[in-house]
From Swiss-Prot:
Site entry: Transition state stabilizer: R18
Primary gene name: aroQ
Protein name, entry field: 3-dehydroquinate dehydratase
Stated family: Belongs to the type-II 3-dehydroquinase family.
Organism: Bacillus cereus (strain AH187)
Top EC class of this enzyme: lyase
Top-level taxonomy: Bacteria, Bacillati, Bacillota, Bacilli, Bacillales
């Protein structure tokens, strides 16, 4: 059974409360439960992790290489400025799919650039929680191609 790590960054623990007009009413717990169920139907074991701390996310990315076949990552606001997370992704050999609930390219100009996307296998934005499922499908396809 393939193992995948789902990492959600800062403020995503506030889903369902924070800016529901942008992120929707669903909670992180709902998202994680739905993703685990979807992964199970695909024969994938999914572990979920959320942190508001850059170092904790970096540590988890480093550890993932020896445990998981791939990572689905929503770096939150770190997307736009964390060269440390970018370098952590670049330092591992497993594929990472970047996902965002909202379309970062339609929002404030400071959100348009992702410093992490260039070292990811791909980026999925703007499809709400469904984007996470798309990321899982894409990751599984990437692993089949390898």
């Amino acid at each position: 059974m393939k193992k995948v790590l789902l990492v959600n960054g800062p403020n995503l623990n506030r889903l369902g409360v924070r800016e529901v007009n942008v992120y929707g009413k669903g909670t992180l717990a709902t998202l994680e439960a739905d993703m685990k169920q979807e992964a199970e139907t695909m024969g994938v074991e999914l572990e979920c992790f959320q942190s508001n701390h850059e170092g904790a996310i970096i540590d988890r990315i480093h550890e993932a290489e020896d445990i998981y076949e791939g990572i689905i990552l929503n770096p939150g606001a770190f997307t736009h400025y964390s060269y440390a997370i970018r370098d952590a992704i670049a330092s591992i050999s497993i594929p990472v799919i970047e996902v965002h609930i909202s379309n970062i390219h339609q929002r404030e100009s400071f959100r348009h650039e992702s410093v992490t996307a260039a070292v990811c296998a791909g980026q999925i934005v703007g499809f709400g929680f469904y984007g996470y499922k798309l990321a899982l499908f894409a990751l599984m396809e990437k692993l089949r191609e390898a």
